[in-house]
């Protein structure tokens, strides 16, 4: 294979962020597995494979289109990214993104011809596209969209499972527990990221909580949201759907959240520069907390 084509192929793979797609597939399994355990279906099945494939394709399209709309920013901040480095042309990237969106939505329509399931897939494709195009620059609404999209993989897995197992869309209320958990955890992480990026966001005119109201307010918002995650963490076990393995790992998540808030609180108390440095460590801890949380729900279903 000629060197140029090999570089383009590597660029196309890099654009879809494979490690993030693995996480998306796992969170889809949380929703699918929760509904399957309630209705007596197989957790790991061809139905789940289709659901994960749809989510992965739509998410991959979202990551590609994000790089497409971030060309100007990446020229300065990330010149090694596939498009700005010249490995993938902007036109090829845009075609690639729309192809991924289209294939994912076609699979959703063909494998589960249900208006709610297909409509939810379309909604998510539109949101990830519009987030990249303009919503990300709105600040708080952008934070909410990111949190929604992260949690929506669980919702889609649950909707798709009910379609495959029951033949109709039924969303048990207990399936919404991991959805709320993921939404709040990611939203809190977005508030922390807003502290980390406060200087650049202020220059770009992005109205995050940290920019509009200060890093202390953004910190207090993250405390409120992430504190709610800790408060809610026992309820999945209490519901009877998730076993003791969930509870043990959920406690690890709680510790990671407490750690991130503690180091961020100390940083905020010392001033802006310390807050920014502390937010990097806090965000890394929260990213780990999200992964452990996903594993908690998966282990809790076994």
UniProtKB/Swiss-Prot annotation:
It is an enzyme of class 2 (transferase). It catalyses: sn-3-O-(geranylgeranyl)glycerol 1-phosphate + (2E,6E,10E)-geranylgeranyl diphosphate = 2,3-bis-O-(geranylgeranyl)-sn-glycerol 1-phosphate + diphosphate. Prenyltransferase that catalyzes the transfer of the geranylgeranyl moiety of geranylgeranyl diphosphate (GGPP) to the C2 hydroxyl of (S)-3-O-geranylgeranylglyceryl phosphate (GGGP). This reaction is the second ether-bond-formation step in the biosynthesis of archaeal membrane lipids. Belongs to the UbiA prenyltransferase family. DGGGP synthase subfamily. It comes from Hyperthermus butylicus (strain DSM 5456 / JCM 9403 / PLM1-5). This is Digeranylgeranylglyceryl phosphate synthase. It is a multi-pass membrane protein. Keywords: Cell membrane, Lipid biosynthesis, Lipid metabolism, Magnesium, Membrane, Phospholipid biosynthesis, Phospholipid metabolism, Transferase, Transmembrane, Transmembrane helix. GO terms for molecular function: geranylgeranylglycerol-phosphate geranylgeranyltransferase activity; magnesium ion binding.
């Amino acid at each position: 294979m000629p060197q140029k084509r090999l570089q383009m192929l590597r660029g196309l793979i890099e654009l879809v962020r494979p490690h993030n797609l693995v996480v998306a597939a796992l969170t889809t399994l949380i929703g699918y597995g929760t509904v399957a355990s309630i209705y007596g279906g197989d957790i790991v099945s061809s139905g789940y494979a289709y659901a994960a494939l749809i989510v992965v394709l739509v998410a991959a399209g979202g990551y590609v289109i994000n790089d497409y709309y971030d060309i100007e920013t990446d020229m300065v901040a990330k010149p090694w990214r596939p498009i700005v480095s010249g490995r993938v042309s902007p036109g090829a990237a845009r075609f690639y993104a729309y192809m991924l969106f289209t294939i994912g939505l076609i699979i959703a329509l063909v494998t589960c011809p249900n208006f709610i399931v297909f409509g939810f897939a379309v909604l998510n494709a539109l949101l990830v596209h519009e987030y990249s195009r303009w919503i990300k620059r709105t600040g708080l609404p952008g934070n909410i969209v990111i949190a929604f999209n992260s949690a929506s993989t669980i919702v889609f897995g649950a909707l798709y499972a009910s379609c495959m197992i029951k033949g109709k869309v039924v969303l048990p209320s207990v399936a919404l527990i991991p959805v709320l958990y993921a939404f709040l955890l990611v939203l809190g992480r977005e508030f922390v990221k807003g502290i980390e990026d406060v200087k650049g966001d202020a220059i770009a005119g992005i109205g995050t909580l940290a920019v509009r109201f200060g890093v202390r307010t953004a910190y207090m918002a993250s405390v409120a949201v992430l504190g709610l995650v800790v408060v809610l963490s026992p309820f999945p076990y209490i519901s009877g759907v998730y076993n003791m393995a969930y509870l043990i790992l959920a406690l690890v998540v709680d510790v990671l959240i407490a750690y991130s808030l503690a180091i961020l609180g100390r940083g905020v108390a010392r001033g802006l520069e310390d807050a920014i440095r502390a937010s990097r460590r806090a965000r890394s801890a929260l990213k780990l907390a999200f992964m452990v949380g996903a594993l908690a729900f998966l282990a809790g279903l076994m």
